[in-house]
Amino acid sequence: MLVPKRVKFRRVHRGKLRGEAKGGKSVAFGDYGLQALDSHWISNRQIEAARVAITRYMKRGGKVWIKIFPHKSYTAKGVGVRMGNGKGTPDGWVAPVKRGKVMFEVGGVSEEVAREALRLAAMKLPVRTKVLSREEVGGESNED
């Protein structure tokens, strides 16, 4: 499970997820990527479920890159606790993902395998997604 080793502050503001992602909108490492079409918080459990779905489908072939990390804690008050008395205790970790961000990339497998693996991963995530290829986005080419 992805969690930060150390954080400066345990409790952080929720913030707003407005607009598009500033960077990470193209396929940089692999040949195919999974791009978010909505903005949403993605928990470390959802990231792990998507990673497992991709790696199980690809079996031993190919490589997976996870381009998001859950660095933001979210808090929750216990069940039956009255309002007030400060902010709740940290309950989990999330990665704030804005629209347009490429979350996962795969490489070293055929197009059919990559698209199906990313489709299975997309089912585990709370955002609408699109599968991109390096050629569609105009990413760097691997030809010398």
UniProtKB/Swiss-Prot annotation:
One Pfam family matching this protein: Ribosomal_L16
GO BP annotations listed: translation
GO molecular function, a single term: tRNA binding
UniProt keyword RNA-binding, yes or no: yes
Signal sequence, renumbered to the chain: none
Keyword annotations: Ribonucleoprotein, Ribosomal protein, RNA-binding, rRNA-binding, tRNA-binding
Cellular component terms (Gene Ontology): cytosolic large ribosomal subunit
Keyword tRNA-binding: yes
Family classification: Belongs to the universal ribosomal protein uL16 family.
Role, per record: Binds 23S rRNA and is also seen to make contacts with the A and possibly P site tRNAs.
NCBIfam families: rplP_bact (TIGR01164)
HAMAP family to which the protein is assigned, alphabetical: Ribosomal_uL16
Quaternary context: Part of the 50S ribosomal subunit.
Name of the featured protein: Large ribosomal subunit protein uL16
Name of encoding gene: rplP
